[in-house]
């Protein structure tokens, strides 16, 4: 009779989840599953609301990445209005979205994942957390706080507040950038750039200590998907977080699908529902479920592009691409990809702020609804974010579908958990470090479970190993 190991809750992620590891009669890992245990139902209670409220309403899906939902939602509403928003509004939205990328990636890398990198996967859990980092590695801890602070301050300067700004609206943004705020933001960027470069240098110096994790943390063939935009000559694919078209690549580096407009996402993506989790499982239609596994997020975005489009980030991207002959398949390298994206974000914000029309006061297009349906797609920190709305003749929402980055990654996270569990978990004697690795592979995806169910720190943990008759064979307690 099989046995089970249950990790409940998974720590240092956003939201509530657990991991179940099934063992066979010989004590070997047979299967492992990632379960999202919270339910929120945002799609359903949006019904009946005016579509113009959707950016602010869906922004409440998450307190960590509200800007991401603002962007995708506003783009869906732009489609319903059938307007082309002013170019300055596009640039201002892009700046806020990049600031969101910076602050969220900083939270993921410095606060949630750096304890594993600094203290090791087998480190004492009593100190393997952000407070332990503050005590032993104060410079890195301060860098993380400052980088996230800068990202949040840029959001506040543009939108009026750091959490749930109401500045991104259907048709553009509600107010232009002032010369004073432009200068304030520009003055913050040199420090942010220095932190990004310093942290990248440190990470590249320690990555060889984690060769085993690189080889076993979600390292398997899959598709990758993200938005991309063309380079100026149209021959290369460039890093994109706000606009662009969808691209799919296979594990050999072959472009499977390219140039997909946002409103055609349903031609390629479908969603499966499983009984043991509130998180849906999107898959690539042509391969079916569950074979149509694909990944989104920082790793996917860097795999799918030829260049970032900014000087220092392009140098780092060249080094990143040199790590493998094709796409990088290891989810552990999501950490590396986040650092490159933060550097790109800082450089790109500086470029946009120096555009001659960035202070233009024409930042919003007004119209009544001209379509009954709209789709908005953008790149959130964790990956591709999709909002799809339908309205009635009164402009009220009748149907909503939100496919969140963590949802896109659900099949990949489950496969990653199984791979790590099979490599590290030994039923004869449970060790905290074994189980931390199972959690740590989930942290490489930086899942946002509030978002993904349309729903930190060191949390209590009890892991029990039960025998065939339910007898307690071993347990690990934390907290």
Would you name each region that the model predicts?
Residues 390-391:
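Aromatic-rich beta-strand edge motifs centered on tyrosine
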Residues 1-384, 394, 404-479:
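Active-site bordering "gate/hinge" segments
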């Amino acid at each position: 009779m099989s046995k089970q190991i249950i990790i409940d809750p998974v720590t240092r992620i956003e939201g509530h989840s657990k991991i179940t590891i099934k063992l066979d009669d010989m004590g070997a890992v047979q299967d492992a599953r990632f379960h999202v245990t919270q339910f929120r139902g945002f799609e359903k209670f949006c019904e009946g609301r005016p579509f113009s409220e959707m950016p602010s309403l869906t922004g409440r899906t998450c307190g960590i990445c509200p800007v991401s939902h603002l962007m995708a939602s506003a783009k869906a509403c732009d489609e319903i209005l059938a307007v082309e928003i002013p170019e300055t509004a596009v640039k201002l939205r892009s700046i806020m979205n990049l600031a969101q990328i910076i602050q969220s990636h900083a939270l993921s890398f410095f606060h949630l994942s750096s304890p594993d990198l600094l203290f090791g996967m087998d480190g004492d859990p009593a100190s393997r957390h952000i407070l332990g980092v503050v005590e032993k590695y104060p410079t890195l801890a301060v860098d993380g706080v400052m980088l996230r602070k800068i990202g949040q301050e840029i959001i506040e300067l543009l939108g009026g507040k750091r959490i749930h700004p109401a500045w991104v609206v259907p048709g553009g943004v509600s107010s232009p950038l002032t010369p004073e705020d432009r200068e304030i933001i520009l003055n913050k960027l040199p420090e942010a750039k220095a932190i990004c470069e310093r942290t990248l240098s440190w990470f590249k110096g320690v990555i060889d200590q984690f060769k085993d994790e690189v080889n076993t943390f979600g390292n398997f063939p899959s598709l990758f998907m993200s938005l991309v935009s063309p380079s100026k000559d149209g021959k290369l694919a460039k890093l994109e977080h706000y606009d662009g078209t969808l691209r799919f690549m296979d594990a050999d580096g072959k472009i499977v699908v390219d140039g997909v407009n946002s409103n055609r996402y349903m031609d390629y993506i479908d969603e499966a529902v499983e009984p043991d989790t509130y998180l849906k499982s999107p898959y690539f239609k042509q391969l079916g479920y569950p074979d149509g596994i694909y990944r989104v997020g920082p790793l996917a975005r860097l795999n799918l592009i030829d260049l970032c489009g900014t000087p220092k980030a392009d140098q780092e991207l060249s080094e990143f691409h040199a790590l493998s002959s094709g796409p990088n398949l290891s989810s552990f390298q999501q950490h590396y990809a986040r650092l490159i994206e933060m550097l790109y974000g800082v450089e790109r914000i500086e470029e946009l702020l120096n555009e001659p029309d960035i202070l233009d006061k024409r930042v919003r297009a007004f119209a009544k609804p001209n379509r009954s349906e709209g789709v908005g797609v953008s790149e959130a920190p964790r990956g591709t974010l999709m909002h799809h709305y339908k309205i009635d003749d009164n402009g009220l929402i009748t149907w909503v579908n939100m496919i969140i980055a963590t949802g896109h990654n659900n099949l990949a996270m489950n496969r990653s958990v199984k791979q790590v569990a099979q490599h590290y978990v030994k039923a004869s004697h449970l060790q905290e470090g074994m189980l931390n690795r199972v959690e740590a592979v989930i942290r490489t995806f930086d899942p946002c479970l509030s978002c993904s169910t349309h729903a930190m720190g060191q949390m209590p943990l009890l892991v029990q190993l039960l025998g065939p008759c339910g007898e307690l064979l071993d347990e690990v307690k934390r907290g």
